[in-house]
A protein has these predicted regions:
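Glycine-rich phosphate-binding loops that contact phosphosugars or nucleotide phosphates
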Residues: 1-83
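Internal, active-site/partner-interface "lid" segment
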Residues: 40, 54, 78-108
């Protein structure tokens, strides 16, 4: 399970962490706060650093969610390489649209 929280203290996520731990689910947390409950509960922590959000109160997750997207895209690319995930496998779960059409042509 992957959790993302800039401060790592999002109360809505903490009960889910407990359930995951009880079920033996591995936890990855992306956060700025390495001392936070989410970071402390994680098997793997990815430190995210955002100097400032774009809104005038520095409160809305604008810059941090953009950075999070980049982290997730990098993780996806790394996992595809690490696991040897193939285009044929992706085509099975994404059969439609231009991407599905292209993937299914390659799979033939």
């Amino acid at each position: 399970m992957v959790f993302a929280s800039r401060g790592g203290k999002t109360k809505e996520l903490l009960p889910i962490v407990d359930i995951c731990k009880a079920k033996g689910v591995h936890i990855i947390t992306v956060t700025e706060n390495l001392e936070s409950p989410l970071a402390q509960a994680a098997d793997v922590v990815i430190k995210q650093y955002v100097n400032r959000e774009t809104d005038k109160w520095n409160a809305q997750g604008t810059t941090s969610t953009t950075a999070l997207c980049m982290i997730f895209h990098a993780l996806q690319a790394a996992l595809i390489e690490y696991t040897g995930y193939r285009a044929e496998q992706f085509a099975l779960i994404h059969p439609g649209g231009a991407v599905g059409e292209r993937l299914n042509k390659k799979a033939l």
